[in-house]
Amino acid sequence: MASSSTQPITTADKSILTPLMTLEGHEPYAWNNSTSDGEQEELKYISCISYFPDGKQMISGSRDKTIRRWDLRKGKEIVKDREVYNRKVLKVGVSRDGRWVVHVIAGEKGIKVSEVETGIVRTFDEDSWIDCIDISADSTLLAGASWNQVRIWNLDTGASPFKIGGYLYEALGLSEDSRKLAVRSSDSKERHLQVWDVQTQKLDVQKSTHSYLRSSHVPIFWTTKHKTIVTAFNSPDDDHYSISEFDASTLNTVGAPFKHTSQICRLALSTDCVLLASASYSTIKLWAFESRQLLASFDVESPLTLLLSPDSRQLAYTSFYDAKIRICDIPANILASIESVCIPTYIHHLHANMFILPIFFAVDLMVPLQFPATSPLPRSHIVSGTGIVPYV
């Protein structure tokens, strides 16, 4: 764990992140712009991405109303596995054991849960618009939040032993042992970071701030031995330009924050808690998690999703301005610099499946979501997803 006296080191220069592989196939989404005499305009971004546990396949969802599966060894779509829907896809995610695929479709209530082997699809929480989701490390539980409640389901039985409410929920994450649930939420006066006991359904600890700048697109990650969490939750003076680590028992900050010069829109943590990736309006940064040292800073136009591969050797991202998935090797010198540090843990990939607005929007337009995840998925992956997804 980083010492509380640790100071961030920012010595990396800006550089270009060159893709090793670019996945193409998702189509632009055409819509009528009422302010331009009904002219057709196109939105090209991919809402959400998630790795399968072995790192050989990836799944993605888009505004083109499709969920697509990709063979990363060939760099091509597995066309037979394509799924087509009536509305845009907001979230997708894969469980750590590869047994379950979950997704959320715009305009449809509930979470779709598909068993990969049998193809059986069930819907959880058919009465609510789902905003953020997470799958437990042992692939048995699914956590989901609508605008005013959080629930946890057993993936096998569909039973829902956990339910809380009362806030507008932005992000959530189950601890590695599934005993604790961290949630970020807000009400009319404050924003809150909370840790709940899953079995007793009691609030363990809460931290509040008067900041009104929401960070619904930034997921919550649990780190080593489920003792600390990482997310964006700052005082009004910070303008949400930093990421902090919190002690899960007290919610006191641990070590120095990770600083950006503009609003943070995405976050990913490696499976060994050694490497942290973060994104803002035009930049993706790589950090040494323990020392807080900035290892690299890359110029990337409007990154929308961010995901580290299960082996933490590659970085995948999408942009707001095209329908491509770019997969890049993490530079060898960066891998070498952190190779000696190892803190085993599992971090969800689900977070990376969070749908995000471009960060130049000053406020979030709140309507059902996507799937940082965040957000968080297989703990053998990184996540990219939870949070309330703005409507665009």
Predicted regions and their residues:
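WD40-repeat beta-propeller superdomains and closely related acidic/aromatic-rich repeat-like regions
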Residues: 1-392
